[in-house]
Curated annotation (Swiss-Prot):
Localization annotation: Cytoplasm
CDD domains in the cross-refs: ThrRS_anticodon (cd00860), ThrRS_core (cd00771)
Annotated protein name in UniProt: Threonine--tRNA ligase
Region feature (Catalytic): 208-499
UniProt-listed SMART domains: tRNA_SAD
Stored HAMAP family: Thr_tRNA_synth
Source organism: Campylobacter jejuni subsp. doylei (strain ATCC BAA-1458 / RM4099 / 269.97)
GO BP annotations, alphabetical order: threonyl-tRNA aminoacylation
Amino acid sequence: MEKEVIAYLDNETIIDSQSVKNTNLKEIYFDNSKESLEVIRHSCAHLMAQAIKSLYPEAKFFVGPVIEDGFYYDFCVESKIGEEDLVKIEKKMKELAEAKIEISKYKITKNEALAKFQNDDLKQEVLLRIPDGAVSIYKQGEFEDLCRGPHVPNTKFLRFFKLTRVAGAYLGGDEKREMLTRIYGTAFADKESLKEYLAIIEEAKKRDHRKLGIELKLFTFNDEIGGGLPIWLGNGARLRSKLEHMLYKIHRLRGYEPVRGPELLKADAWKISGHYANYKENMYFTQIDEQEYGIKPMNCVGHIKVYQSDVRSYRDLPLKFFEYGVVHRHEKSGVLHGLFRVREFTQDDAHIFCMPSQIKEQVLEILAFVDNLMKLFDFSYEMEISTKPEKAIGDDEIWEVATKALKEALDEQGLKYGIDEGGGAFYGPKIDIKITDALKRKWQCGTIQVDFNLPSRFKLEYTDSDNEKKQPVMLHRAILGSFERFIGILTEHCAGEFPFFIAPTAVGIVPIGEAHIAYAKEIQKELLELNIDSEVYEKNESLSKKIRIAEKQKLPMILVLGDDEVAKRSVALRDRRAKEQKNLSLDEFIKLVKEKMSEVYF
C-alpha cells in the first residue's frame, strides 16, 4: 500500500488521483510526506463527518479543514457530545474505513448547490463564503459534502487516526453567532507515526503552560478583568523581568537605542500608516476631546516619529531603535489560548532604518542575534523567505535588491531556508523564524520584515553623499515575537524547569531548624546582590516536606542547611538534574552560581 498513488502535484497544487488525466504530474504516494498527510487528513475529516452523520442523523456540518498536525470539523447536533463520545465515533469511522468505500467528486453550479442544500443553514453559510462559479462536492457512500479537496480515492487508506478532543467554536469565529461543536483529530499513513504523535500529545498535556502557569504561580486570568488579559504573579513577573533585562543588555551591546512611543495615537496617524483602512477591526478606538484615538496594535508608527524627530544623513544610518512595546489587538474570544493568543502583549520590537545597500549587513547582525539567543534556550530553528506577491508597492529593482540581500545573508550564515514564492507582504519581502521545541513542535516567533511602504507613506528621508534626498528602507524585527507567547513556549519546552539565569526562583534555601534561619537569610541576601532570586523555606514543617515543596516548584538548586553547614559556613547542594546532594563551602557555591549567570552574556 505504501507505493499506491493517492494524488498528484501540479506545481504547488494537490489534485485528486481521479481528477488527473495528465500522468506527467508528480505522484503523491501514500506515506507521511507533507502533501500526502494533507490529503489523508482532509479525507479523514470527511470520514469523521460521515461517522457522526451515521450516529447523529440530525447533524449539520460547517467546515472541516486540515490544520497543523491534524484536522477538525465544526458541526451542530441536538445531542451534547463530550470526550466520552469520541470512542463510538472512532469505532464507526473504523467500520467505514474497513468497508473500502469509493470516494468520488462531482461539480455543480453555486445556484444548484444553494438549492441542493436549501434546508441546511450551515451549508448556506459556507456557500455565502464561496465565489460564484462551480463548486465541488465529495461523495462517499450516502455521505456527501462541499469541499475543494483533495481526497484519497477510497476509505481503505484511512486506517491510522485518532480523535483527540472536543471543543466549542463560534460559527465563523464570531462570538455573536451560535456555538458549534468542534472535534479535533489527526491521521497518519502508518501505526508507528500515530503512536509517536499520541505520546507527544500526552507529554504536551503535562507541559501545558496554562497548567504549569497555575502550579508554578507564574500568571493567571480573571473573568472580571477580561479574556486575553494575563495577570502576572510574582514568579511570572520575575521571570519576565529577568528576560527583559538580559535582552536589554544584549540590545545595547549590539548598538540598538532604546526608545518608547505612546500606547495611544490619534486616528490620523493610523490613517497615514494604512492601519485604519486595513487593520481597524483588530484595533481598539476611543474619543478624547472629540477626536478619535487608536490604541496601538504595533510599535512601528512611534519609531517612525522618533526617526522624524531629527534631520538624518547617510552618515547616521543605520539607526536601530528598540522597545518593549505593549500592544493591544482585538482577538475574538474563541481564539484566545493561554499566553499563546492574548489581547494585550509586549513585543521585543526593533526597527532599523537603513540604506538599501545596508540591508544584508543588518540582516546578518540580526541572524547572529537570533542564533545566539536560540542556542541559549536550546531551541533549534529554521528560516523561510517570503518573496514579492502579485500586488506589491515599490519597483522591481528594490524588491530584487532586498530579496537578494535576505538570501545572501542566510547563505553566508550557512542557514537552510525555504522559500514561499509570492508570500511576502505587499510592502516588502521577509524572513520568518520558526523554532522547534523539545516536543518537535514548530512555532512561528520572530520576523525580519523589509518595508518600503511606511517610509513612503510618512515621507521619510535622509541626505545621501551627493546631498540628495533619499528614502530609507525600514526593517521590522522581532526575535521572541512577544514576551507572553515566548514565555508560554519556553515553559512547555523546558516543562517549567527554567534555565538558572532566568528562573523566577533560582535557589531554594531549606534551614533544618529555627537556629539555621539566620544563616539562610544571610545567603539569600548575598544571592540577591548577584541578582539571583531565592526563597527561604522557614515554616515549622518537616525537612522532607520543605524539600518536596521546593522540588515541586522545579527550582534549579536547593540548599539544605543544618548545624554542620552553619559551623563550617558551607551548604548541602541538591541539583534538580543530578538529584543528589553534595557539600560545598559557601565561597565555592557563590563561585558556582556566578559561573551559571555568566552563561547569558554573548
